[in-house]
A protein has these predicted regions:
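HhH-family (HhH-GPD) DNA N-glycosylase catalytic core used in base-excision repair
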Residues: 1-199
Length: 199
């Protein structure tokens, strides 16, 4: 058995089996996940995965340094790219997020150290989530969302942040009968915690 959502496409199966929930500590990979989740706003994750390589090409292999330096010419280039999500507002937001990401790195040493301090460096296994009872947001994603917005990040509401935390492994939301659930618990430090829902 596996998480129910994984079987919708080849891209979703690969993403579930190889990436989703695996603790991630490389800053550029964290920026990639944050950008993908932010670009997803109002869209399906399956669509984002289908367009992932286009997004990678448009956003300089998800290099925050390069994206932060994008100009109006780059925005025009992206808008004219085939298969791209053509939202000027989102594209500008990703450039702003890259700038905020670099500022946070400078302040905290790395985005990794900033993010993982919220869980003391451990993957969080919320009680009940392994049964498939996952919220769209919780108190943790509310707190991180609030802090990111204060730092100038855009498209980082609590629902998007919750999905980001699932993606980068800070939250292990695989279902208990999914092989990945126990595999990740055996391979990485984790902590079982009681869910606290946001208001």
């Amino acid at each position: 058995m596996a998480c129910q959502w994984k079987n919708s496409s080849a891209e979703m199966i690969s993403y579930h089996d190889k990436e989703w929930g695996v603790p991630t500590h490389e800053d550029q990979k964290l920026f990639e996940y944050l950008l993908l989740e932010s670009m997803q706003a109002g869209l399906s994750w399956a669509l984002i995965l289908r367009k992932r390589e286009t997004l990678r090409s448009c956003f300089a292999n998800f290099s925050p340094e390069k994206v932060a330096a994008f100009t109006e010419e780059d925005i025009a280039r992206i808008m004219h790219t085939e298969n791209m999500i053509k939202s000027v507002r989102k594209i500008r937001a990703m450039i702003q997020n890259a700038k905020a990401f670099l500022a946070l790195q400078k302040e905290e040493g790395s985005f990794d150290s900033y993010l993982w301090k919220f869980s003391d460096g451990k993957s969080l296994c919320y009680q009940g989530h392994e049964k498939g009872n996952m919220p769209s947001k919780n108190a943790l994603s509310e707190a991180i969302s609030k802090d990111l917005k204060k730092r100038g990040f855009q498209y980082t509401g609590p629902v998007i942040v919750y999905s980001f935390l699932q993606a980068c492994g800070l939250i292990n939301d695989h279902e208990e009968d999914c092989p990945c659930y126990q595999t990740l618990r055996k391979a990485y430090p984790y902590q079982e915690v009681e869910e606290i829902f946001s208001c």
